[in-house]
């Protein structure tokens, strides 16, 4: 029998994680939780309709007494749900970001440490083989690095509805940015010291204080710099919406995802993690000033689907529960990436540079 697992949140991410749990003998689903009945009934039906359903997290936690809890809910609930589950003795898989404040993030991590329970944060790109290779090559380009990344989503219908719901508690550069800022931190291995952010409200269908477009710039203490851009909504352009590019003194590496960057795919969940190929450029010159080496195209053979990536995340979770993952390093990475994106939000609101200690 696998670890008794409570799935909290039955949207896109929660459903993918639930499918992973059903397929893995290491886990056994003991309940599905969502505030609205529609999503959990739909997911339960897909999974065979045999799991208990709950509309309230606390009731589900008390009744099922799970070994593990998977939390894929809106950001404002993350800290409360995670600390409650950890305090109850459960291991926790928590979708990013850890919390909507740095203080909340610190509280969640401290609770996991005190409870001696595994806390794994859902940074899906960390388990993607091509993104692992992308990061490895970038580390070999010398210092400083220039890291250029974005993910704009031209969303309509139900996807735009989901984005507007998300905007009630977070911004695009926080919700999506933590993934790519985490990658930047792992590429440089350096400490972030300075953040600038700008943001814009491009729709009357969102709240007056909400913004659905944002751009951040981060400076590291080794001189590396990075920018990240994210926007959601039917107005978003699909021109250059998928930029993943790193430059260093020795050359450059880029994700050359032609199909993922096709028009009409910017809001496609599978396209967000697609790589297809890496283009490696070498800066070395011959004595006559011409390039010594041609660019290399490295085709990606292992291109996991979104559901497969979620399964790999759950394998990491299982390994962490069994003491095979350095969780202190994982928690530091999660906290650092959140600090950067929250600083970008603050910078955009206050119109000033934010310096990180």
Residue ranges and their predicted role:
Residues 125-208, 214-217, 351:
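Predominantly a Rossmann-like dinucleotide-binding segment in NAD(P)-dependent oxidoreductases
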Residues 107-124, 142-149:
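Rossmann-fold dehydrogenase core element
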Residues 17, 49-111, 309:
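Beta-loop-alpha module in the N-terminal Rossmann-like domain of NAD(P)-dependent dehydrogenases
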Residues 1-48:
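N-terminal Rossmann-like dinucleotide-binding module
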Residues 71, 94-95, 119-121, 255:
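Hydrophobic residues in well-ordered beta-strands that form the structural core
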Residues 1, 27, 68-71, 302-304, ...:
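C-terminal helix-rich "cap/oligomerization" subdomain common to oxidoreductases
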Residues 181-270, 311-323:
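Contiguous beta-strand/loop segments that form the cofactor/metal-binding neighborhood of enzyme cores
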């Amino acid at each position: 029998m696998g670890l008794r697992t409570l799935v909290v949140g039955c949207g896109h991410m929660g459903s993918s994680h639930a499918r992973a749990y059903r397929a893995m003998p290491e886990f056994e689903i003991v309940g599905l939780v969502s505030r609205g009945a529609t999503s959990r009934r739909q997911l339960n039906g897909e999974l065979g309709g045999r799991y208990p359903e709950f509309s309230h997290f606390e009731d589900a936690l008390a009744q099922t007494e799970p070994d593990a809890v998977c939390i894929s809910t809106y950001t404002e609930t993350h800290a409360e749900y995670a600390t409650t589950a950890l305090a109850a003795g459960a291991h926790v898989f928590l979708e990013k970001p850890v919390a909507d404040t740095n203080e909340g993030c610190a509280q969640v991590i401290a609770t996991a440490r005190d409870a001696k329970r595994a806390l794994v944060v859902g940074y899906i790109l960390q388990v993607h083989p091509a993104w692992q290779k992308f990061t490895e090559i970038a580390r070999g380009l010398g210092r400083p690095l220039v890291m250029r990344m974005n993910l704009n989503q031209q969303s309509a219908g139900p996807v735009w509805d989901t984005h507007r719901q998300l905007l009630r508690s977070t911004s695009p550069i926080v919700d999506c940015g933590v993934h790519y800022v985490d990658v930047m931190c792992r590429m440089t291995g350096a400490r972030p010291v300075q953040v600038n952010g700008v943001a814009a409200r491009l729709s009357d269908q969102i709240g007056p204080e909400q913004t659905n477009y944002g751009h951040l710039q981060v400076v590291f203490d080794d001189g590396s710099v990075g920018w990240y851009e994210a926007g959601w909504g039917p107005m978003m352009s699909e021109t250059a919406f998928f930029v993943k590019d790193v430059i260093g003194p020795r050359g450059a590496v880029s994700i050359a995802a032609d199909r993922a960057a096709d028009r009409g795919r910017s809001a496609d969940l599978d396209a967000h993690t697609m790589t297809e190929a890496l283009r490696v450029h070498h800066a070395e010159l011959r004595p006559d000033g011409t390039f010594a080496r041609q660019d290399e195209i490295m085709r990606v053979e292992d291109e996991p689907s979104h559901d497969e990536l979620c399964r790999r995340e759950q394998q990491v979770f299982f390994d962490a529960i069994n003491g095979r993952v350095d969780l202190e390093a994982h928690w530091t990475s999660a906290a650092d990436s959140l600090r950067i994106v929250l600083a970008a939000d603050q910078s955009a609101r206050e119109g000033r540079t934010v310096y990180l200690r």
